[in-house]
């Protein structure tokens, strides 16, 4: 996403250039999102035992996050263009952190699934603008390639780290801690983002907002993701319910 930025620094040495610090902060934020996608899988048996989920209900601990995350990525990226990428990143990170605490404190099925849905919203807002911010901070091709390499390594390795972290936290503490641990990390990343990541200026809500289009596209994407994770997975693609949901999703697009 293209945005106007303040100068992130002039020193070209990675050790002293503020841009490289900003890159590490953005990668840390992205790592939180990647970890969350895998850390929950390890804790599902403990969550099911503690909260009494049925097998089909347990799937929504994962699916609630996927539906909101996948459905809102596009509109979150557009919000970055309108309001400024850093502003959307910070708002998404705050929402993700608060909802992580809500997940960790959840005492029933409804509270956990609802908090997971909100977590997906925050994850979408943070993820959608991260790559564009990195590209904007590193316009020179050689530096941009290095920055993208660091970002790609963090994103690809986060899944393995999440599986390990999920197992350790669940075994040594409880499943609640796979969510609560996001709180201190989120606070630190939020503070460092405000300090090191350059502020961005969006084009303005009044110049580029298409409310009806945003509602239709977001509804279509969320319905499409829901179709994949629910009726298609449970009933198959040949089921009437799956086909109707998929058709409505296409019509909304």
Where on the chain are the PLM-derived regions?
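Hydrophobic transmembrane-helix bundles of small-molecule transporters
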Residues: 171-253
């Amino acid at each position: 996403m293209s945005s106007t930025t303040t100068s992130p620094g002039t020193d070209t040495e990675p050790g002293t250039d503020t841009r490289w610090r900003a890159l590490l902060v953005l990668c840390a934020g992205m790592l939180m999102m990647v970890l969350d996608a895998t850390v929950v899988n390890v804790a599902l048996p403990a969550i099911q035992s503690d909260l009494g989920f049925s097998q089909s209900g347990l799937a929504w601990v994962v699916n609630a996050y996927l539906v909101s995350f996948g459905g809102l990525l596009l509109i979150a990226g557009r919000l970055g263009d309108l309001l400024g990428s850093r502003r959307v990143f910070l708002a998404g990170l705050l929402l993700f952190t608060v909802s992580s605490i809500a997940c960790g404190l959840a005492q029933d099925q409804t509270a956990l699934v609802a908090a997971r849905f909100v977590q997906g919203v925050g994850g979408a807002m943070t993820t959608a603008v991260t790559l564009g911010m990195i590209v904007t901070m590193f316009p020179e091709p050689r530096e941009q390639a290095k920055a993208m390499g660091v970002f790609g390594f963090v994103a690809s390795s986060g899944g393995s780290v999440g599986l390990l972290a999920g197992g350790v936290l669940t075994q040594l503490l409880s499943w609640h801690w796979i969510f609560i641990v996001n709180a201190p990390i989120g606070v630190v990343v939020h503070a460092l983002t405000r300090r090191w990541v350059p502020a961005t200026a969006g084009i303005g809500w009044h110049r580029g907002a298409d409310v009806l289009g945003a509602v239709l596209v977001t509804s279509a994407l969320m319905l499409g993701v829901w179709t994949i994770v629910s009726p298609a997975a449970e009933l198959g693609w040949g089921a009437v319910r799956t086909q109707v949901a998929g058709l409505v999703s296409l019509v909304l697009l």
